[in-house]
Amino acid sequence: GKPNKPRPAPIKPRPPHPRL
């Protein structure tokens, strides 16, 4: 069988950080 290639993690939208 073919070795499974690790899929890149899905990009998660980061919550907006409060600007100081």
Curated annotation (Swiss-Prot):
Belongs to the apidaecin family. GO terms for cellular component: extracellular space. The lineage of its organism: Eukaryota, Metazoa, Ecdysozoa, Arthropoda, Hexapoda. It comes from Pimpla disparis (Parasitic wasp). Residues 1-20 are annotated as: Disordered. Antimicrobial peptide active against many Gram-negative enterobacterial and plant-associated bacterial species. Not active against other bacterial species like H.pylori, P.mirabilis, B.pertussis or N.gonorrhoeae. Coiled coil: none annotated. Keywords: Antibiotic, Antimicrobial, Immunity, Innate immunity, Secreted. Residues 1-13 have a biased composition (Pro residues). One of its GO terms (biological process) is defense response to Gram-negative bacterium. This is Apidaecin 2+. Induction: By bacterial infection. It is found in: Secreted.
